[in-house]
């Protein structure tokens, strides 16, 4: 591509290009970097000038590749100029001036290439400059880090050297101290040699003292064992007394709970009694109401009886009217039969009238009479129908009255059933009240028994409390005496310990004096060391024994303080027990008063119960009478119902007969109408013939 595009290039052109691009490379954008790299660049130019020419050629080729799209753009612009030559003369002039000034197209191309290459190289140079700046910054940071590490390494060296020096000094000091300690140990050995002989004699004396102390310790141990046994006995006695007190407290709590339960039961019984009184009052009210209702029912029954009598009378009158109606119906039926016979006769006469037209005039008179008779029959039928409608109205009224009476009787029966139920409820409530009163009496008897038992138990508890008080006071006196003895023994043991300590101090002083006077016994050091260790062990054992004795004494003192505290607590508990007993006595007195009140209430309740029994017996008698009256009324009502049913049957029969009569009347009317139509036609024919005869005349 490069050879085809640029064939005439030679060394002169390459020199021109190099002369044109040198100022671009020598632009003062990064003078420091150029200064740093001047010797490197000089060496490179001096070594290989051919490589620089090759680089220039390569740069020209790259610029040519980058300019190719610009040439295409210029060709497109020239095509646009050929199309718009008439509209843009000024642009052509400018192009001509540019072509005239250029003279040679290769020079213009080179200028364009130089401009484009300068832009590309400038951008590449800027990128390289930024990369160099970043690399310089990283190098400087690395140099700073290296300097810091070197400083840290130097400081570590100095610290290590100082530590080594200090360790050497410490080792020297330790060596000196060890030498001094060795010398001190040698001196101690020398002094120990002098003290060993004196220790032998002192050990013998100390053994004697230790044996004496052992005998004294054994005696003290025996005394301590005796005191421990006495203390155990006292503790057992205290436990027994505490158990007794707990048992008494439990009994007291049980008694208090029982008393509270009895109080609650008394309250509940009183509330139940109040409820029963209210129930009795309500029952008395119900009884009075039932009496009033019975009076009202008796009055209503009387009224019903009067109404029944009235209705019976009305029914008798209605039966009479029904008999009259039956008679009238029979008469109407007879008249109907006669009218039927007359109709048959009229039909026969009509047939004869047809056969005998000459006898029409005579038949007209008979027809008029028959018509009059028919009108009379129609009037009679109308009256019969009106009477039948009246009878129907009466029957409907009677049925309504019958239904009303049935409703009244049903309501009365419901009221009677309700009264029976109320009476049964009252009887059940009275029986329940009786059973509850009997239960209350049983409970009161139980309460009396419990109160007597409580009084007995309270008296027993008082006796037991007095005995426990006496025994506790004895135990307290014994514990006081034993504590005083223990305190005296403790004082004696403390004095003995002080004496032994003083003797030990004197012996130690004498041992020091003997150790200063005797320095010639070096050969017996080993034996003396053994003896000294043995004596040390014995002394340690004696010290441990003394410490145990002191600890036991402290423990005894603490036990004495505890026993004092227990004594105080027992005294407080005794005071509380006495207070609780006083409260129990008060509660017992209050319960006795409440029992007396309950007995009085029971007596009053029994009186009231007897009164209620009498009232209930009276109510039963009244209810029996009311039941008998109700049964009588029920029997009367049943009789009335049967009579009503018979009347209803009769009314139904009358209705059926009336319906049959209506049907027959309608048939008669239809027959009469059928007879009237041909008669009227014949009359019209006769009238027409008469008119014709008159016209002919």
Curated annotation (Swiss-Prot):
Q: Which UniProt keywords apply?
A: Chloroplast, Coiled coil, DNA-binding, Membrane, Nucleus, Plastid, Starch biosynthesis, Thylakoid, Transit peptide, Transmembrane, Transmembrane helix
* Polar residues composition bias: residue spans: 616-627
PTM info: Phosphorylated in vitro by human casein kinase II.
Cysteines engaged in disulfide bonds, as pairs: none
Show the transit peptide stretch.
1-41, 42-79
Lumenal, thylakoid face residues: 80-106
Subcellular localization: Plastid, Chloroplast; Plastid, Chloroplast thylakoid membrane; Plastid, Chloroplast stroma, Chloroplast nucleoid; Nucleus
> Which residues point to the Stromal side?
128-697
- The answer, when asked if Plastid is one of the entry's keywords, is yes
Regarding the membrane, this protein is recorded as: Single-pass membrane protein
**Which residues fall in a compositionally biased region of kind Basic and acidic residues?**
604-615
Membrane listed as a keyword: yes
Q: Where are the transmembrane segments?
A: 107-127
Q: Example GO biological process term?
A: starch biosynthetic process
Gene3D superfamilies of this UniProt entry?
Answer: 1.10.287.1490
Q: Which residues form a coiled coil?
A: 203-671
What GO molecular function annotation could you give as one example from this UniProt entry?
DNA binding
Location of region: Disordered: 81-100, 599-629
The Gene Ontology CC terms held by the record are:
chloroplast nucleoid; chloroplast thylakoid membrane; nuclear matrix
User: What does this gene product do?
Assistant: Required for the initiation of starch granules biosynthesis in leaf chloroplasts. Anchored to the thylakoid membranes with its C-terminus facing into the stroma where it is essential for localizing PTST2 and SS4 to the stromal spaces between the thylakoid membranes in order to begin starch granule formation. Associated with leaf chloroplastic nucleoids in vivo. Binds to various chloroplastic double-stranded DNA fragments without particular sequence specificity in vitro.
Domain text: The C-terminal part (439-697) is necessary for DNA-binding.
Describe the protein's quaternary organization and the partners it interacts with.
Answer: Interacts with MAF1. Interacts with PTST2; the interaction is essential for the initiation of starch granules biosynthesis in leaf chloroplasts, for the correct location of the process in the stromal spaces between the thylakoid membranes, and for the association of PTST2 with the thylakoid membranes.
State the protein's name: MAR-binding filament-like protein 1
Its encoding gene is what?
Answer: MFP1
């Amino acid at each position: 591509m490069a050879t085809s595009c640029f064939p005439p290039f030679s060394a002169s052109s390459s020199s021109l290009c190099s002369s044109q691009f040198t100022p671009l490379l020598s632009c003062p954008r990064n003078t420091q970097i150029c200064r740093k790299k001047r010797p490197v660049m000089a060496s490179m130019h001096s070594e290989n000038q051919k490589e620089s020419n090759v680089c220039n050629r390569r740069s020209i080729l790259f610029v040519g590749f980058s300019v190719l799209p610009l040439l295409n753009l210029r060709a497109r612009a020239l095509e646009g100029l050929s199309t718009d030559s008439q509209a843009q003369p000024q642009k052509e002039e400018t192009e001509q001036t540019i072509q005239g000034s250029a003279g040679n197209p290769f020079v213009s191309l080179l200028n364009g290439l130089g401009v484009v290459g300068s832009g590309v190289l400038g951008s590449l140079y800027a990128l390289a400059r930024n990369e160099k700046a970043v690399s310089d910054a990283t190098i400087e940071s690395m140099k700073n880090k290296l300097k810091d590490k070197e400083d840290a390494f130097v400081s570590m060296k100095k610290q290590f050297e100082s530590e080594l020096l200090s360790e050497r000094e410490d080792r020297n000091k330790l060596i000196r101290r060890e030498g001094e300690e060795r010398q001190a140990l040698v001196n101690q050995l020398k002094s120990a040699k002098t003290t060993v002989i004196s220790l032998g004699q002192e050990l013998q004396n100390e053994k004697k003292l230790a044996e004496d102390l052992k005998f004294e310790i054994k005696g003290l141990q025996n005394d301590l064992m005796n005191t421990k046994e006495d203390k155990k006995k006292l503790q057992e006695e205290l436990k027994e007394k505490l158990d007794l007190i707990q048992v008494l407290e439990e009994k007291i709590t049980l008694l208090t709970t029982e008393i509270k339960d009895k109080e609650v039961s008394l309250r509940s019984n009183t509330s139940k009694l109040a409820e029963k009184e209210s129930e009795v009052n309500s029952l008395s009210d119900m009884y009075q109401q039932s009496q009033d209702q019975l009076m009202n029912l008796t009055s209503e029954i009387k009224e019903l009886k009067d109404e029944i009598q009235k209705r019976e009378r009305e029914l008798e009158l209605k039966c009479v009217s029904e008999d009259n109606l039956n008679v009238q119906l029979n008469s109407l039926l007879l008249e109907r039969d006669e009218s039927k016979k007359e109709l048959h006769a009229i039909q026969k006469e009509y047939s004869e009238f047809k056969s005998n037209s000459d006898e029409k005039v005579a038949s007209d008179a008979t027809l008029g009479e028959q018509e009059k008779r028919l009108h009379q029959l129609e009037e009679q039928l109308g009256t019969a129908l009106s009477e039948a409608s009246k009878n129907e109205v009466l029957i409907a009224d009677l049925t309504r009255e019958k239904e009303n009476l049935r409703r009244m009787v049903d309501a009365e029966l419901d009221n009677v059933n309700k009264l029976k139920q109320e009476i049964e409820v009252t009887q059940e409530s009275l029986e329940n009240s009786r059973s509850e009163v009997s239960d209350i009496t049983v409970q009161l008897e139980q309460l009396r028994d419990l109160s007597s038992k409580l009084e007995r138990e309270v008296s027993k508890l008082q006796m037991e409390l007095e005995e426990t008080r006496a025994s506790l006071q004895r135990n307290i006196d014994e514990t006081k005496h034993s504590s005083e003895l223990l305190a005296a023994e403790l004082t004696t043991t403390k004095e003995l310990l002080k004496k032994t300590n003083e003797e030990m101090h004197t012996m130690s002083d004498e041992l020091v004096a003997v150790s200063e006077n005797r320095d010639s016994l070096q050969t017996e050091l080993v034996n003396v060391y053994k003896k000294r260790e043995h004596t040390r062990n014995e002394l340690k054992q004696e010290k441990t024994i003394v410490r145990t004795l002191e600890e036991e004494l402290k423990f005894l003192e603490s036990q004495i303080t505890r026993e004092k505290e227990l004594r105080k607590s027992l005294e407080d508990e005794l005071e509380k027990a006495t207070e609780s007993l006083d409260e129990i006595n008060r509660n017992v007195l209050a319960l006795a008063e409440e029992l007396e009140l309950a007995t009085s209430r029971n007596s009053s309740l029994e009186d009231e119960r007897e009164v209620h029994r009498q009232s209930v017996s009276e109510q039963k008698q009244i209810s029996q009478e009311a039941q008998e009256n109700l049964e009588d009324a029920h029997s009367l009502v049943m009789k009335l119902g049967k009579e009503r049913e018979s009347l209803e049957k009769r009314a139904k029969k009358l209705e059926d007969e009336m319906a049959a009569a209506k049907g027959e009347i309608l048939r008669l009317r239809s027959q009469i109408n059928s007879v009237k139509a041909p008669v009227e036609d014949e009359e019209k024919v006769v009238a027409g013939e008469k008119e014709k005869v008159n016209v002919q005349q």
